[in-house]
Amino acid sequence: MATGLIKAKEYDWKDSNLALFGSDTEKQVKKDSAATEPAWKGAGQKEGLKIWRIVNFKVTEWPQNQHGKFYNGDSYIILNTYKPDPKSNELAYDVHFWIGSQSSQDEYGTAAYKTVELDTFLDDKPVQHREVQGYESELFRNYFKQGLTILEGGAETGFHHVKPTEYKPRLLHFSGQKQQIYVHEVPLVKERLDHKDVFILDLGLTLYQWNGKESSKEEGFKAMQYLGLMRSERPKAEAETLEDESTPESHKFYTSLTGTDEPNLVKPLVKEENQLLKVSDAGGHLKTTEVKRGAVNSKDFSSNDVFILDTGDQCFVWVGKGRFAVGEAEWTRISHAHLMKTCHPLAPIHVIKEGQLCKAFNVAIAA
């Protein structure tokens, strides 16, 4: 398990033009995928959550006991299958691709491509979503009732069963409210401690839970659950719960925080004035033109067109029925290109075909 933040450029794929399609990456993906993708076998046949990880252009299933745990060096595809009407047998889908902050452009492109492939496999019924580490949508976070856990490195390092006596220290930060608890690994430095949150210092056979004086009950409870799970995996490990103000500076918890800090690049997304853009392909090239700003409602959308609705904290691509035949991958790419020109390039992207269910979109056009 990696202990410090990886030195590679974070969100390196962000500045890519995502020119995956027709590229060597696409050819490699198609070659590995062949006629059918074996990972999709059985996908979408019953309600529930399925997760896959991208490994060398291939889609590999992510174990159910690892659901909610992601590594920042990896990319994942998440499929949620549900019944909009409990009285009906009809199934609906949301398919997300999640990109870690240290994920490569190839992984980003492969995840995006494979998400479109899964959409096609499910007869174009899913709503597609792009999720970026630290900027996940509320819909995505709500899948994981125990909260999201983001760890350093790739899953390859995570699956090595390191003996506790050889374990490299790590500091886990628990933040959020109610069901929206976010757990992520941070540098081993005292400056990262926040009185409003809870932390776990994992030293292998010694575990400390540090409760900030202003932390919430939900954060403390989540950390306690996490600590219990760690102890079940390491029966010989000893755990101690520490309170912020009553723990002396000489305590091993503090003296163990000897790492090097790294800048925290995650900045909260902020709701901004709505911006509605129309996508056209005049001259054979996709381009966007602003239609309006401010309040947007259903009457602003036409079945013969494609629109981007940018709310600052989210980006929606609405595809009219008359444009379904156009390659869906293009809609992810055009929204990615649009966001690159804004101050919120990592906002969640939702691709919605006319008539599909998307609660966040309905809220956005009703505001």
From Swiss-Prot:
Disulfide bonds: none
Tissue specificity remark: Expressed in circular and longitudinal muscle, pseudohearts, pharynx and gizzard. Also expressed in male germ cells at the proximal pole of primary spermatocytes in 16 cell-stage morulae, and in the distal parts of the spermatocytes in 32 and 64 cell-stage morulae. In the spermatids of the 128 cell-stage morulae it is expressed at the proximal pole of the elongated nucleus and the distal pole near the base of the flagellae.
Record region (Actin-severing, Ca-sensitive): 296-366
Gene Ontology annotations of biological process type: actin filament capping; actin filament fragmentation; actin filament polymerization; actin filament severing; actin nucleation
Disordered: region residues: 235-257
Sequence segments annotated as region (Actin binding): 1-185
InterPro entries noted in UniProt: ADF-H/Gelsolin-like_dom_sf, Gelsolin-like_dom, Gelsolin-like_dom_sf, Villin/Gelsolin
Spans annotated as Actin-actin interfilament contact point: 106-109
Keyword check for Aminoacyl-tRNA synthetase: no
CDD domains the record matches: gelsolin_S1_like, gelsolin_S2_like, gelsolin_S3_like
Superkingdom assignment: Eukaryota
Region (Actin binding, Actin-severing): 186-295
UniProt keywords, alphabetically: Actin capping, Actin-binding, Calcium, Cytoplasm, Cytoskeleton, Developmental protein, Repeat
Localization terms from the record: Cytoplasm, Cytoskeleton
One MF term in the entry's GO annotations: actin binding
Oligomeric form and interacting partners: Interacts with actin monomers and filaments.
Protein name, UniProt field: Gelsolin-like protein 1
Source organism: Lumbricus terrestris (Common earthworm)
